[in-house]
Amino acid sequence: MQAALEVTARYCSRELDQYGQCVAAKPESWHRDCHHLKMSIARCTSSHPIIRQIRQACAEPFEAFEKCLRLNEAAVGNCAEHMRRFLQCAEQVQPPSSPTTGEAQPLPAS
């Protein structure tokens, strides 16, 4: 879960901040009034390579978790076991190695 939060915070901080502000401002109706912002976080994170890789590798537990959330909107705590299975799978996924990470590469010795 820490990895997912880090990716979300790093690449989707604007969306995450907007959603958090909406939830805080509308404690009675956040699930309805902030849904569009929740979806913007989902769109943002879905475009990140590690998230796409997790969704592919962990499709089955992810779909079960999403289904549980839809069925238990008012009691998401009922989905703890589904979440645990998904996160256990997600933690096993390694980020794709990319030669162009934007970090400086050492020069070859001459």
From Swiss-Prot:
Residues bearing PTM N-acetylmethionine: M1
Gene expressing this chain: Chchd5
Protein name, UniProt field: Coiled-coil-helix-coiled-coil-helix domain-containing protein 5
Motif (Cx9C motif 4): 79-89
Positions occupied by motif Cx9C motif 2: 34-44
Cellular component terms (Gene Ontology): mitochondrial intermembrane space
Localization annotation: Mitochondrion intermembrane space
Keyword Glycosyltransferase on entry: no
Motif Cx9C motif 3: positions: 58-68
CHCH domain sequence ranges: 9-52, 55-97
Domain of life: Eukaryota
Keyword Acetylation: yes
Motif, Cx9C motif 1: chain positions: 12-22
Main location class: mitochondrion
UniProt entry keywords in alphabetical sequence: Acetylation, Disulfide bond, Mitochondrion
UniProt-listed Gene3D superfamilies: 1.10.287.2900
Disulfide bond positions: C12-C44, C22-C34, C58-C89, C68-C79
Subunit structure: Monomer.
